[in-house]
Amino acid sequence: MNTFATQIRLTPTPMALQTRPLSPFVRPLLAVVLLLEAGLLLTSCGRKYRVEGSSTVTTLDGKTLYLRTLDNGKWVSVDSAEVEHGLFRMMGQVDSVVMVTLCMGEEGIMPLILESGRLQVTLSNDVLEAHGTPLNDALYSFIDKRTELADRMEELERREARLVLEGKNFDDIHAELETEMTSLSEEINSYVKNFIQANYENILGPGVFMMVCSTLPYPVMTPEIEAIIDSAPTTFRDNAFVKDYLAKARENMQLLQAQQENALTARN
């Protein structure tokens, strides 16, 4: 199982803002945001935040957008603003760094990190962006780069499909593309691992770890995950949500091993 080569992105579809979360990537990511909002608070001095947003999505005009977090399992609105002529603004005091969700009604649009500084948010039918503060810059730079790598992998897969449809020998196709696919897969794994390791001590480390793990069909240990955990400091390993994932993953691995042993015994 290639842990980090799974397609994850934050690119909206044209009608998404009207009816649903903006991307297949948003669902697992927002699920992670819910967890992180509940427990990943980093103490800081009380400082002011400023969110300035622009939207080219006409259906948003007149709608109210919310910054929401979880408090004891319930949604709490941290701030809100009405979109007027494609613009919205929120300002307030922040006492801790926390992941929040920009929402319209009950639908999550995109994750944001609420921290001291001025954050610029762009909403369109093509892309979602958040820049202007250190952690948001880092998060969306990661998302952009990860999407670029995923697009390259998709193109290789499309090329493989085209060659098959053209009637070329499958073994020849595999030989032609295997090296390139393996190299790109390793690049993706390395990029994600290095990003998490570089952010072990802040909200991005466990946030991105859970984000990529949430794309897996179920919690499981892989060589990539083992490598991240093996070099992680105690603060990362002791994060409640990382610990919960690892406990479930190791339990699943034991179940899988038991199933394999039972199947082998039955055959013998």
Where are these regions (language model features)?
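Bacterial Sec-dependent N-terminal signal peptides
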Residues: 1-54
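Charge-rich, solvent-exposed alpha-helical interaction surfaces
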Residues: 176, 180, 187, 191, ...
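Charged, long alpha-helical assembly modules
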Residues: 197-200, 204-268
